[in-house]
């Protein structure tokens, strides 16, 4: 599934494999993947920090949408500068988010068209996302694909056939945009 905003749209921190693309920003929503594969979502400096590693990777984007089971007040007071907007300045647009349950065991990917931040937060609280962060926005960038094998070759299938049908196989090749992948353990 898709990553977050480009560096030019917030300069949010990112690190993978020990290589820091941008330093972490205090107070921003962060997804961290531990060296053991454990996933955590929280606020950098409060829930997560450099001393909490070792991390295989971490990525920041905007502020937390839900924090400790409650909707962040910024969801209702934030502007396009906080949460992003379409090229036309619309704050109701395709949006995606990643949430995690209170026990850090279940990840939730939430996405859809015509979402305001309050609507996205409502969807995340409906699935009991204890902590959650905004990922990318706008139709071209909100994307989730499941990969299956047919005749020995990987085939990508979009989560939502309408709206996620552009460049369906984008996660099967090199990309200038960041993304996450989840693999089942054997």
Language-model regions, residue ranges each:
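Gly/Ser/Thr/Pro-rich low-complexity, intrinsically disordered segments
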Residues: 1-186
